[in-house]
Amino acid sequence: MENFEIWVEKYRPRTLDEVVGQDEVIQRLKGYVERKNIPHLLFSGPPGTGKTATAIALARDLFGENWRDNFIEMNASDERGIDVVRHKIKEFARTAPIGGAPFKIIFLDEADALTADAQAALRRTMEMYSKSCRFILSCNYVSRIIEPIQSRCAVFRFKPVPKEAMKKRLLEICEKEGVKITEDGLEALIYISGGDFRKAINALQGAAAIGEVVDADTIYQITATARPEEMTELIQTALKGNFMEARELLDRLMVEYGMSGEDIVAQLFREIISMPIKDSLKVQLIDKLGEVDFRLTEGANERIQLDAYLAYLSTLAKK
């Protein structure tokens, strides 16, 4: 790499046509662009699926080169209280659009972080300035947005970026950056991302910085992620009743990859879901794993909790 530009920003979509893996959403938004008008919008979905990129691309397509004059981005998780609505949002909303634009756009990222009082104030602001201003709200969980706001918005649900769409775009980035990537390295990127395109690009840039060829080993190492087959082996070993052997495998994963207890739990969950075992057994394993996850969030010792989980799996072999 010859420069220090962040690839996530360098390859951020500049138009709606460049947004990856959200075809249905983009098709609907293009209709608004053609009519040169949009309602209030609510984008919901997991991180890294293109919500922010889509909002900015929409503003570019609507307003052209001077889009920045009539677009402001705020992050609600930084300022959760009602003051951000009373001051910053109102201050921008009450000024007239610039350069002949029909309205201005306020993009509020992570809107589900706003308190209930702040959301109620936001709803009133949306009504008050609806003639000169449109709001685009972004959230991970639409259930955390109060119903009066939901009812005033067109809701767009962003899904994890599909594997093939992500693979195609990652290969394009590799070609432009002169990065050599193996097939297993590409598959590893897809796996660790979990549909989060931002995470995949960041991992690719990190891997490209430390080696001439990006392969699976590099990806798993820099992202502190175990290979799927290693995690499956851990589960199967414990289910066979080999507790001490499973414990040694856990030791190796935590030391080799530097994984935290939360990392282990998240990956165990992912592998259990995809394992070819009876649904009734999956229910048992996931139910118990949920208890471990809860205890970890409460501050319990991660090693004791993970050992206890492996011990539980080992007891199932005797039933």
Curated annotation (Swiss-Prot):
GO terms for biological process: DNA repair; DNA-templated DNA replication. Keywords: ATP-binding, DNA replication, Nucleotide-binding. One of its GO terms (molecular function) is DNA clamp loader activity. GO terms for cellular component: DNA replication factor C complex. ATP binds at residues 45-52. It holds the Pfam family AAA_lid_RFC1. The keyword Nucleotide-binding applies. SUPFAM superfamilies: P-loop containing nucleoside triphosphate hydrolases, post-AAA+ oligomerization domain-like. Signal peptide: none annotated. InterPro entries: AAA+_ATPase, ATPase_AAA_core, DNA_pol3_clamp-load_cplx_C, DNA_Rep/Repair_Clamp_Loader, P-loop_NTPase, Rep_factor-C_ssu_arc, Rep_factorC_C, RFC_lid. Part of the RFC clamp loader complex which loads the PCNA sliding clamp onto DNA. The complex possesses DNA-dependent ATPase activity which is further stimulated by PCNA. Belongs to the activator 1 small subunits family. RfcS subfamily. Heteropentamer composed of four small subunits (RfcS) and one large subunit (RfcL). Both subunits interact with PCNA. This is Replication factor C small subunit. The lineage of its organism: Archaea, Methanobacteriati, Methanobacteriota, Archaeoglobi, Archaeoglobales.
